[in-house]
Amino acid sequence: MRYFTNVHDLGDLKSALAEAFEIKKDRYKYETLGKHKTCLLIFFNNSLRTRLSTQKAARNLGMDVIVLDVNQGAWKLETERGVIMDGDKSEHLLEAIPVMASYCDIIGVRSFAHFENREDDYTEKILNQFIKYSGKPVFSMEAATGHPLQAFADLITIEEYKKKDRPKVVLTWAPHPRALPQAVPNSFADWMNEADVDFVITHPEGYELDPKFVRGAKVEYNQMKAFEGADFIYAKNWACPGVTRPADYGKILSKDMNLTVDAAHMAVTNDAFFMHCLPVRRNMIVTDEVIEAPTSLVIPEAANREISATVVLKRMLEGLE
């Protein structure tokens, strides 16, 4: 596997899940695979789980790890061609990428949506420049429109905790004080559509996700109705994706606190597990009561980020041989 940016790059999900559970039993089974190989992790944005879990995964495989925070200690980077660089940006990404690539074997990139131009975000301008100009295998540690490492960990978690063969999984929008990218909900939808689940998406009008991620999923605007009989509730906020309201791309259209996941919402489910990628705004996205309940999976879900990253890096290392 040379690139990892979406669910299709991973291939057959059943074999990927089997590999994940194999690694979960013995994280160091392939500890010599990455000997004398270097993984470069490039962060344009903040990170806790992705930063720690991906470093741990690389070391599980025997790799050396270099971490670069682009906005802390590195030269400011220009990303546009044709710009007269007479401002505060000292280096162009087109030189920086091949230089960084010369020091490593595999590159991970984390770069969020900017909400300035939908086309730039949805064509994954930054991530694709690394793919085009690095000459090295590249994986996404969250890009403008997707977070596949998170979605893979989510799928592992659902597979681990499901109580029936085809559970009902609900992705629900919930309020947040800031405008957040669609990367996590996009990827979650993309992966659930490939999994053997009954998948439902619920959100206020105007928050419709891009059809290429929604695909055949059921969209229910009545949140309580969507929750009925659910086995897993996955809560996440996202700003307007600009699908039905292009002029509102990246804007906050609602802060309806009635959509916060609370005990009343969970009461209509099938004793559902609660999931969230973290970090979470308590008592906006979800109440203390729900996130602290025995059915909350946010911690094991986060722990599975190490497993998803280990599987991905293992396959990328195997592709180098």
Q: What does each model-found stretch correspond to?
A:
Residues 212-289, 295:
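Rossmann-like adenosine-cofactor binding region
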Residues 34-41, 47-159, 281:
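Phosphate/diphosphate ligand-binding glycine-rich loop within oxidoreductases
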Residues 33-39, 166-168, 271:
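Phosphate-coordination loops involved in phosphoryl transfer and adenosine-cofactor binding
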Residues 292-321:
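C-terminal helix-to-coil terminal segments
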Residues 44-62, 66-67, 159-236, 241-242:
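Glycine-rich phosphate/diphosphate-binding loop of Rossmann-like nucleotide-binding domains
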